[in-house]
Amino acid sequence: MSNSAMSVVILAAGKGTRMYSDLPKVLHTLAGKPMVQHVIDAANDLGACAVHLVYGHGGDLLRQTLHEDNLNWVLQAEQLGTGHAMQQAAPFFNDDEDILMLYGDVPLISVETLQRLRAAKPLGGIGLLTVKLDNPTGYGRITRENDQVTGIVEHKDASEAQRQIQEINTGILIAGGADLKRWLAKLTNNNAQGEYYITDIIAMAYQEGREIVAVHPQRLSEVEGVNNRLQLARLERVYQAEQAEKLLLAGVMLRDPARFDLRGTLQHGRDVEIDTNVILEGNVVLGDRVKIGAGCVIKNSTIGDDCEISPYSVVEDAQLQAACTIGPFARLRPGAELLEGAHVGNFVEMKKARLGKGSKAGHLTYLGDAEIGDNVNIGAGTITCNYDGANKHKTIIGDDVFVGSDTQLVAPVTVGNGVTIAAGTTVTRNIADNELVLSRVPQVHKQGWQRPVKKK
């Protein structure tokens, strides 16, 4: 086992022609995150001293998307093979460090497998990640003598006997910096593809008497690459099934694990229940006994104990204290905050608004840029008119206020404690405590009124 420092090289220069997309292949997302970001995260979790990202196609988009402080951007202007890609990064290698080679389109490689690979790397030799396949067609074969790895032969260059070998190269390896630089300098493109294969260094190491140790991943999905959208979709389901299994074993009740997506992280309490077709994005926290109805989307939000979110509600960048109820068909936008026991019903939208303890907005309401006190009733059709066409303004409502249906609160405006606002009122001025406010056009009755008759 090597105790050397370690840097990581991630190959991410490919165009991804079979994705049929203008987006670089490695920026296509898995579980809501670019594939290459999964690999960068694994490198960081391993404690890499540096991460060298070899890029080519779509470099500007890559730079706009990835913002890791320790990324060293290495341009591969021409894509002439994996060995050529590593040659571009080689000037940045330290002689006394280990270099781990990863791929931006192999997103599910686990930290645990990479730790085992690093631990298995012999001094002065190479650690190689391999798998055995029933159908190895198209993959580089691992050649052995007396069970010792001697080289890798690409499928197009393999003999018929070599093509019967089931152990294949995953492309992931680790070697010392000084050794790797020396071997990379010796690579040639004398092969069927006319490319520089990184795999040729295995034979070089063997000829020098260096040991090559093969390690197998825990799961085949860890080393599956993505070349088209079908493969990406399959890996997405593999990843989601793994997340669902972990949650079920940790006590979360997923009504249908096959219809649940976690696209980020979830912290959860006890006795959490999640119905079908729920999507959790970003960093989500669910307290004890939280219930999430079917079809809900929750992003970067904290949901307190005993909250219930009814079906088809969307909660984004919001904070819910204990015992709140939401939906169905509610939308909490960034900055929404519900204090203990608050209720937001169907077709209610909140943004940058706080709803106090025990307060209710039952239906068909917009609350934006608002501070609403405790024990307030917001009637159906109420709107905080917060935008004047250029700027946003705030509405402040005190405690124990009753807001009748179809009320418009034209901000900036402040409503005192204990106020009653009659249905159909347009509030344009501040209201003092305990006042009744109404503004209606006088009701007109015309006896004997007849409706117009259509002209023929």
From Swiss-Prot:
Mg(2+) binds at residues 105, 227. One of its GO terms (biological process) is regulation of cell shape. Its cofactor is Mg(2+). The active site is at 363 (proton acceptor). It catalyses: alpha-D-glucosamine 1-phosphate + acetyl-CoA = N-acetyl-alpha-D-glucosamine 1-phosphate + CoA + H(+); N-acetyl-alpha-D-glucosamine 1-phosphate + UTP + H(+) = UDP-N-acetyl-alpha-D-glucosamine + diphosphate. Binds 1 Mg(2+) ion per subunit. Acetyl-CoA binds at residues 380, 386-387, 405, 423, 440. One of its GO terms (cellular component) is cytoplasm. Keywords: Acyltransferase, Cell shape, Cell wall biogenesis/degradation, Cytoplasm, Magnesium, Metal-binding, Multifunctional enzyme, Nucleotidyltransferase, Peptidoglycan synthesis, Repeat, Transferase. Residues 1-229 are annotated as: Pyrophosphorylase. GO terms for molecular function: glucosamine-1-phosphate N-acetyltransferase activity; magnesium ion binding; UDP-N-acetylglucosamine diphosphorylase activity. Pfam families: Hexapep, NTP_transf_3. Residues 230-250 are annotated as: Linker. Its main location: cytoplasm. It is an enzyme of class 2 (transferase). Residues 251-456 are annotated as: N-acetyltransferase. Pathway: Nucleotide-sugar biosynthesis; UDP-N-acetyl-alpha-D-glucosamine biosynthesis; N-acetyl-alpha-D-glucosamine 1-phosphate from alpha-D-glucosamine 6-phosphate (route II): step 2/2; Nucleotide-sugar biosynthesis; UDP-N-acetyl-alpha-D-glucosamine biosynthesis; UDP-N-acetyl-alpha-D-glucosamine from N-acetyl-alpha-D-glucosamine 1-phosphate: step 1/1; Bacterial outer membrane biogenesis; LPS lipid A biosynthesis. UDP-N-acetyl-alpha-D-glucosamine binds at residues 11-14, 25, 76, 81-82, 103-105, 140, 154, 169, 227, 333, 351, 366, 377. Its EC number is 2.7.7.23, 2.3.1.157. In the N-terminal section; belongs to the N-acetylglucosamine-1-phosphate uridyltransferase family. In the C-terminal section; belongs to the transferase hexapeptide repeat family. Homotrimer. PANTHER family: BIFUNCTIONAL PROTEIN GLMU, NUCLEOTIDYL TRANSFERASE. Catalyzes the last two sequential reactions in the de novo biosynthetic pathway for UDP-N-acetylglucosamine (UDP-GlcNAc). The C-terminal domain catalyzes the transfer of acetyl group from acetyl coenzyme A to glucosamine-1-phosphate (GlcN-1-P) to produce N-acetylglucosamine-1-phosphate (GlcNAc-1-P), which is converted into UDP-GlcNAc by the transfer of uridine 5-monophosphate (from uridine 5-triphosphate), a reaction catalyzed by the N-terminal domain. This is Bifunctional protein GlmU. It comes from Klebsiella pneumoniae (strain 342). The lineage of its organism: Bacteria, Pseudomonadati, Pseudomonadota, Gammaproteobacteria, Enterobacterales. The gene is glmU.
